[in-house]
Amino acid sequence: MAKSYSNKSLWIVILFFCVFSGCEVRELSSSNESDAEVLSERKIRASSEKQNSHVYIGTGSVQGVYFPIGGVICRLLNRKTYIHRIRCTLESTGGSVYNLRQLREDNFDIVFAQSDWQFNAYEGISTFEKDKPNPNLRAVFALEADPLALIVRQDSEIESFDDLQNRVVSFGYARALQNRIIDDLLKVKKWTSKNFKQIKRINDNQQISEVCSSNVDAVLLLSSSLNDHLKDLDEGCKLKFIAIEGAEVDELVKSKPYYRKSYFSKGEFLDSPKKVSSFGLGATFVAQESTSPKVIYHVVKEVVENFNDFKSLHPSLKKLNKKELPFAGISVPLHPGAIRYYEEIGLLK
C-alpha cells in the first residue's frame, strides 16, 4: 500500500509536543494586533528575561510544513535550556519571502526559507531586487527536499524523461513552481515546446484526473502537494513515477546550487516497486551573520545529536541525510556557529 500523510494532523501532534516541552508559539498577523506590535512585544519580552538568551524562529503558515518542523526544533532546544540558557520561541508567518525580509530587519534570529528564495535574497534578484543583496545571509542547515514528481499511467510506454518527446504533457499552470523548475532543465537539455506534441497548462488539482483519463500522457507535480492530489485517486487508475535524472540534471544542480537531488522511496505515495530519482528545490534554515554563534551552534547540535528523533517527528524529514545538512540546496555561506559544530563532528574539514 502506498504511503500518504496528513500534514494537518501532524502539526497538531507537534504542537502538543511543543506545548508540553515548554516551547512558546506565537502567530503573526492576528486580527487584533499588527506584526509590528507583536515584534515589539517580543523584543520587550526578551529584554526582560535576562537569564536566558532567546531565539525567535520564523516558520510559515500553521497548516504548512515549516511550522511543525519549527516546533520540533524548539522542542529539542528547550529541553536543554537549563544547560545552554537558550529559549526558543516559534512564530507562524507568511512564508519564505516574509521570513527573509524580517530576518534582515533583525525581527527573527533564524527562519525557514525555500532554497531558491534563499539564493534570490542573498543576490538581491527576483522579488528581492528592490531589497538589494543581503550579503550577510548565512545558512544553518538544509531540511527536506521537494522533488519534482513526473507521473504517468502504469501501462504507459514512457520509461524516462526523454520518452516525453512527441507526447502530450502538462507541467501545471503557467506560473506553477514546477513549471519554472522544469523550464531550467529544458534549457540545459536544449529542448523547446517543439520537442513535445503538446504542452497543456492544467491546474494542479486537475492534473491527476487528466492523466487517469488519458487526456495527457504525463503530468508534473511537486512532491509536497501529492498528498492532496492523490488522496481521492480512483482505484482503477494505476500510476507510476518516472525518474528525472542524468547528465543534464547533474549539470543543472551544479550550476544552480539551490537545486538538489532527491528521490521517491519504494512505495512512497504510489505503489512503486523501486526507488525513483528526481530533483527539485528544498527547505533551508537560515540566519544573519550577526545571529549569535552560540545560539546557532546549539541549534545545530541539538538537531544532529537527536537526529533520529528529529526525523521521526515529521514525514517530510524521513529522508534527511546527516551528511547533506551543510550542503543540500545551500547557496549562501554557512553561519560560523554552524561551521564550528560541523567541523567538530567531521561533516566539514
Which positions does each model-derived feature cover?
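Bacterial N-terminal signal peptides that target proteins for export
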Residues: A2-W11
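Bacterial signal peptide processing site
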Residues: E24-R26
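Immediate post-signal peptide segment of exported/extracytoplasmic ligand-binding proteins
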Residues: L28-G58, I158-V168, P336, E343-E344, ...
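N-terminal (or domain-start) structured segment
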Residues: I44-Q114, N120
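Bilobed "Venus flytrap"/periplasmic-binding protein-like clamshell domains
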Residues: N52-K80, I86, D146-S213, N308, ...
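Acidic, polar ligand-binding/catalytic clefts
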Residues: E105-A145, S224-D228
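Pocket-lining segment of extracytoplasmic ligand-binding domains
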Residues: S115-W117, I125-T127, S156, S193-V286, ...
